[in-house]
Regions:
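Alpha-helix capping/helix-boundary segments
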Residues: 98-99
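Arg/Gly-rich low-complexity intrinsically disordered repeat tracts
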Residues: 104-110
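Surface-exposed amphipathic alpha-helical tracts and adjacent flexible/coil segments at the periphery
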Residues: 1-22, 26-36, 46, 50-51, ...
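Aromatic/His-enriched, Gly/Pro-containing loop or helix-boundary segments
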Residues: 116-124, 139-141
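An active-site metal/cofactor-coordinating segment within enzyme catalytic domains
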Residues: 39-43
Length: 603
């Protein structure tokens, strides 16, 4: 039976616990340093607490150490990995092959390694190479189609494939974006991306003719594969990853619950083929709705091939759900044509005639007549209106919004000198006199054993042998119940620790895939140099480079309708095309039609 894992982001301990409570089978979280989100660091103690909580449900905790490392950071990074291993972490996500070199040479190292999407995993050859190095799981590039995912699974079936299913998209293949480093000295491969792709650009042809003026031409919509999970499962993916280690707890609650319910519905259709990777069922106080939390509009990206509507040129900000159109304007209010219900405090927005996003807060809602705190000057009848902050929904999620419990059927049995209690592979016993009861005891036994508050368990039944009618004092039943909970938790911790093993690497790994430019290997330290067998570091952050700053499957030529390969009209502009930032800096575009890829170069 195939275990399916819903993998959720955790900015901090609070978000990690919320993710588990709302149905995640695993969470990924950053340590204090060396994660791909500088602003999402956590202490070893918080990570240890998260491991203890998650492991109650057989859920996993993965820690991101997925930046490139400099020589003066190697000792601290190596020490961090061993500390995370001791804290009970289930796997480490890495980008820097210097850390793999450390794992091979250090006998203390026993934790599983996952190849981060930052290692640019888009071909069967790359995944096969990673498998030969000992990676048991590979996080695939977001750009892959379902057919490409299936091909990787068919050719490298013993590697677990992790795919992104929801959240923000990088316009460049992950790990190969150097635009932030080039423009601002902030390395995306060091967790400090300045999000150049979310900025405004002019698009110019070779004669300087302006084809687009100050649009967000590289800003992609957010990924949403919630309707396509079954396709991804059939293609061979086993872990379904939600992006968002900078997102708040309400985002985590809503998105995790939505995807957990969808996975459960798929499993209900195929109970003999699939099951969840962790234990427990969730009871929600709200109905999950992906449109109600942060999103830039949704796309399935390249899941079914190239699509025209994958980017959001008007704004890189969250627009939220469509709620209607502006109908009638008055001095201090307006009407909305639509069926949505509004609440005081809702955040609404619209795209004005200059293609810019404007937002405002609703001070008072009287049905479909809304009174903003201040009337937007550029609001016009007929404009589409979006809600990017739903106050009623936020209030629901601000409270406890889910309870996760593991159903337990106890088996109570007689022993030679007392009684034993068994469930879920754990058995405990007490010494107690076998005293026949004067009246039936089943009701009291069930009541006492069901008092599992403050634990992840709920009693779904108690099995007793036929004719079992002993009097067992309530205090002893309570002691038996407490012993079982303690024994179960200790057994789970031992099981998790015993499962911390690396995937053996081949004695003769295959050769690494070839890159045309040395900096694309991201070699930034002596351990990585030793791994690749080179004498000098080649990382762009240290040496620069003349190759592409970005390699994108998103193509502006296709988006404008000028891709002849896909049935577009013949271009009327003169090559090459350039992107220009507001400060005048230009970037040359190269359209690699053979590989269906747009490359961005510094001019």
């Amino acid at each position: 039976m195939t275990k399916l894992e819903l993998l959720a982001p955790a900015k901090n301990l609070e978000c990690g616990i919320a993710a588990i409570d709302h149905g995640a089978d695993a969470v990924y979280i950053g340590a204090a340093k060396f994660g791909a989100r500088v602003a999402a660091g956590n202490s070893i103690d918080d990570i240890r607490q998260l491991c203890v909580y998650a492991h109650q449900f057989d859920a996993k905790v993965y820690v991101t150490v997925n930046t490139i490392i400099y020589d003066d950071e190697l000792e601290a990074t190596n020490r961090l990995i061993l500390e995370l291993q001791e804290a009970g972490v289930d796997a480490i996500l890495i980008q820097d092959m210097g850390l793999l070199q450390f794992s091979i040479l250090n006998s203390q190292f026993s934790i599983s390694l996952h190849a981060s999407t930052q290692t640019d995993n888009r071909t069967p050859e790359k995944v096969r190479w990673l498998r030969s190095l000992g990676f048991r799981r590979v996080v695939l590039a977001r750009e892959l189609s379902v057919e490409e995912i299936a091909a990787i699974h068919q050719q490298v079936p013993d590697v677990e494939l992790e795919v992104f299913v929801h959240g923000a998209l990088c316009v460049s293949y992950s790990g190969l974006c150097y635009a932030s480093q080039h423009c601002f000295g902030r390395s995306a491969n060091r967790g400090a991306c300045a999000q150049v792709c979310r900025m405004k650009f002019d698009l110019l042809d070779a004669d300087g003719r302006e084809l687009e003026h100050q649009r967000h031409l590289l800003s992609l919509k957010d990924l949403n594969q919630s309707a396509h999970l079954e396709e991804l499962i059939q293609a061979g993916a086993v872990s379904f990853k939600i992006e968002g280690r900078l997102k708040d707890v309400t985002y985590v609650k809503n998105v995790v619950a939505a995807y957990s319910q969808r996975l459960d519905s798929i499993i209900a259709k195929h109970p003999q083929e699939y099951c969840r990777a962790s234990k427990g069922h969730c009871s929600y106080t709200f109905t999950p709705n992906l449109k109600k939390t942060f999103n830039r509009g949704f796309t399935t990206y390249f899941l079914h091939g190239r699509q025209p509507d994958i980017f959001s040129p008007d704004t890189p900000k969250a627009m939220g759900e469509y709620v209607g159109t502006v109908k009638e304007l008055r001095r201090d209010s307006f009407n909305v044509a639509g069926t949505a219900a509004f609440a005081n405090g809702d955040g609404l927005c619209f795209i004005n005639k200059e293609h810019e996003l404007e937002g405002f807060r609703v001070n008072r809602a009287e049905g479909n007549r809304l009174f903003p705190q201040q009337m937007p000057r550029n609001l016009r009848p007929g404009m589409a209106l979006y809600r990017n902050n739903d106050m009623e929904f936020e209030r629901l999620l601000a409270r406890q919004s889910s309870v996760r419990k593991i159903p337990v059927t106890f088996k109570l049995s007689e022993t030679t000198d007392g009684f034993s209690l068994s469930a879920l592979g754990t058995t405990v016993s007490i010494v107690c006199e076998h005293q026949q009861a004067e009246k039936p005891q089943q009701e009291n036994i069930i009541r006492q054993l069901s008092k599992l508050g403050g634990t992840p368990y709920e009693c779904s039944g108690v099995e007793m042998p036929d004719g079992f009618n002993y009097f067992i004092p309530s205090s002893m039943l309570a002691d038996l119940r407490r012993q079982w909970v303690e024994g179960k938790n200790q057994g789970d911790r031992f099981l998790i620790e015993s499962n911390q093993t690396t995937c053996p690497h081949d004695s003769r790994p295959s050769d690494p895939p070839h890159y045309d430019h040395p900096y694309l290997y991201n070699i930034a330290n002596r351990q990585a140099q030793q791994f690749y067998g080179v004498q000098e570091p080649t990382a762009y952050e240290l040496r620069g480079g003349n190759g592409p700053l970005m390699q994108c499957r998103h193509c502006l030529q296709y988006a404008m309708g000028y891709c002849v390969k896909h049935g577009g009209q013949k271009p009327t502009y003169k090559y090459p095309l350039f992107l220009r930032l507001g400060d005048g800096r230009r970037f040359r575009l190269e359209f690699d039609c053979k590989h269906c890829q747009m490359n961005v170069y510094a001019e």
